[in-house]
């Protein structure tokens, strides 16, 4: 029964359609289609129970574990272009209904879309006409995948389809139907005449202001793509016609165990995070502190001895200059005692 459940789950995952949203500048040309290479990562595997392992199991499971997951390559075709990214959920929900009770209805809509693609007898002609355009665009098109957090995703987009979000990062200039923007010097000259134009020709002044503002602002649109199963195109014949976009599958992948290292069973292991053995470090720190204290005490003693030696030297020098009687008076005034006091104390 477990095998049946796993196979049904895998089938549901494989049947999930692929939707790609491309964010691009308005001046960048629209791509009719492109190759999407999905690097699927291995699913997370539960922790092995070593008590249930055997030699036969290791021989059977060895090749499957070592098997690499091959990338999946599909051709996606343009479906719709919008100017607001907030409509993503509405677009996805319009394509795929989430209610299990309306599965038949949503399936019927999907079949209708297939029939519409089949009725398009000019699809091959359109692809042929756009070969040159796509070759030029594919040479300049560069894409980057946008990683977004799936936590708190109330729309449930990833439950309905494999959704990939990418952005065009190429610097392609508008080629088809491109407007001729004036140079910076011409814009400065026109700006100086705007006050006069507002009085004489208000409409021309408005058009010039709009052109100047549009040249400094960058507007974005969002193109939606999906896999068209009815497009019978071989990879060899169209690999140069359409660019390649490489993405990473955002489904659950093997990025380490969900549980942290603090939850491992062998809590007495030396490499366990909770297990800390600070005895050796503490002993080394105490020895360093003792050495520092000894060094400080020795320095204080040496300084005190140096001061006493200097004081005795100065006393002898003063005594030799003043004499014994005058030195006693000097010592009493300076040091607060006389030579007789020292003799009495001794």
From Swiss-Prot:
The keyword Disulfide bond does not apply. Disruption phenotype: Reduced DNA methylation at RdDM target loci and pleiotropic developmental phenotype. Pfam families: Iwr1. Residues 253-268, 278-312, 323-332 have a biased composition (Acidic residues). GO terms for molecular function: DNA-binding transcription factor activity. Residues 253-346 are annotated as: Disordered. The modification N-acetylmethionine is found at residue 1. The keyword Acetylation applies. Keywords: Acetylation, RNA-mediated gene silencing. Disulfide bonds: none annotated. InterPro entries: TF_Iwr1_dom (IPR013883). One of its GO terms (biological process) is post-embryonic development. Interacts with NRPD1. Associates with Pol II and Pol V complexes. Belongs to the IWR1/SLC7A6OS family. Probable regulatory factor for several RNA polymerases. Effector involved in facilitation of Pol V transcription as RNA scaffold and recruitment of silencing complex to target genomic sites. PANTHER family: ALPHA/BETA-HYDROLASES SUPERFAMILY PROTEIN, RNA-DIRECTED DNA METHYLATION 4. This is RNA-directed DNA methylation 4. It comes from Arabidopsis thaliana.
């Amino acid at each position: 029964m477990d095998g049946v459940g796993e196979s049904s789950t895998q089938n549901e995952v494989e049947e999930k359609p692929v939707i790609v949203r491309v964010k691009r500048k308005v001046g960048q040309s629209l791509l009719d289609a492109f190759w999407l290479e999905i690097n699927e990562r291995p699913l997370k595997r539960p922790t092995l129970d070593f008590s249930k392992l055997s030699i036969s199991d290791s021989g059977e499971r060895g090749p499957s574990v070592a098997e690499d997951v091959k990338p999946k390559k599909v051709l996606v075709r343009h479906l719709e272009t919008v100017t607001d990214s907030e409509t993503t959920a509405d677009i996805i929900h319009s394509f795929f209904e989430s209610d299990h009770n309306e599965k038949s209805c949503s399936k019927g809509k999907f079949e209708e879309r297939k029939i519409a693609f089949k009725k398009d007898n000019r699809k091959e002609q359109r692809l042929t006409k756009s070969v040159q355009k796509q070759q030029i665009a594919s040479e300049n098109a560069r894409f980057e995948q946008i990683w977004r957090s799936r936590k708190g995703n109330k729309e449930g987009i990833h439950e309905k389809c494999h959704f990939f979000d990418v952005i065009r990062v190429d610097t392609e200039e508008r080629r088809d139907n491109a407007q001729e923007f004036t140079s910076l010097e011409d814009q400065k000259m026109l700006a100086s005449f705007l006050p006069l134009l507002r009085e004489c020709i208000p409409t021309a002044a408005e058009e010039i202001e709009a052109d100047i503002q549009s040249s400094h602002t960058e507007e974005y649109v969002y193109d939606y793509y999906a896999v068209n199963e009815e497009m019978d195109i071989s990879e060899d014949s169209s690999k140069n016609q359409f660019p390649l976009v490489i993405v990473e599958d955002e489904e659950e992948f093997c990025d380490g165990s969900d549980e942290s290292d603090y939850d491992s069973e062998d809590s007495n292991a030396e490499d366990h995070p909770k297990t800390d053995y600070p005895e050796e470090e503490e002993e080394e720190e105490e020895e360093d502190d003792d050495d520092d204290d000894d060094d400080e005490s020795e320095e204080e003693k040496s300084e005190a001895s140096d001061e006493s030696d200097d004081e005795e030297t100065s006393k002898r020098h003063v005594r030799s200059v003043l004499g014994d009687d005058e030195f006693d008076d000097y010592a009493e005034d300076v040091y607060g005692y006389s030579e007789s006091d020292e003799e009495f104390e001794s």
